[in-house]
Amino acid sequence: MTSHTMVKVVGGWALAGGLSISLAAAQNGNSPGVTDNEIRIGNIMPYSGPASAYSSIGRVQEAYFRKINDEGGINGRKPKFISYDDGYSPPKAVEQARKLVENDDVLLIFSPLGTPSNTAIQKYLNSKKVPQLFVATGTAKFGDPKSFPWTMGWQPSFHSEGGIYAKYVLNHHPDGKIAVLCDRLK
């Protein structure tokens, strides 16, 4: 699968799930980030910095929300996708999360990218009861609803992915070599 196809697949599924949740919240119209004609959805993405290669994900998400708006929105409400650059810097991610919650009054934070940035904003968003949905990282700690009920991961854990890749290599390249890459966060 090419990276372009992967972005389209991941973006499409994540947006579909996020919009389903947004639709449910929009039904009552009295949630933060929801008005009679708008649903404000926040996003934090590394448009600059060392992970800027992933910025295409944010652009695809923005384009998809534009498409939804062009087709009439959700129950007459237009999603307003507000996406800020964190440069893949945890302190900047915290600043942008606060801006989205406290100034932009978003309903949720949708698909923020990266383990360091999501780690930095997780406690804040949960303390404010702002959904942190479809976290774009494979670190298993983003699948802990008892400790962080307002956070929901998206992709399989890095541990699970590693097992899948190892089985594939062993089955198809039994003499191959395997290198292990891992993050330092628990």
What residues fall within each predicted segment?
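Beta-alpha junction/loop-to-helix N-cap segments that form part of ligand/metal-binding clefts
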Residues: 27-30, 38, 53-59, 71-145, ...
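Short, well-ordered amphipathic alpha-helices
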Residues: 61-69
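Short, low-complexity disordered leader/linker segments with a strong preference
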Residues: 1-40
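Short, surface-exposed acidic/glycine-rich loop or hinge patches that mediate macromolecular interfaces
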Residues: 48, 87, 115, 159, ...
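Short beta-strand segments enriched in small/hydrophobic residues
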Residues: 36-56, 112-113, 177-183
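An alpha-beta-alpha
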Residues: 148-186
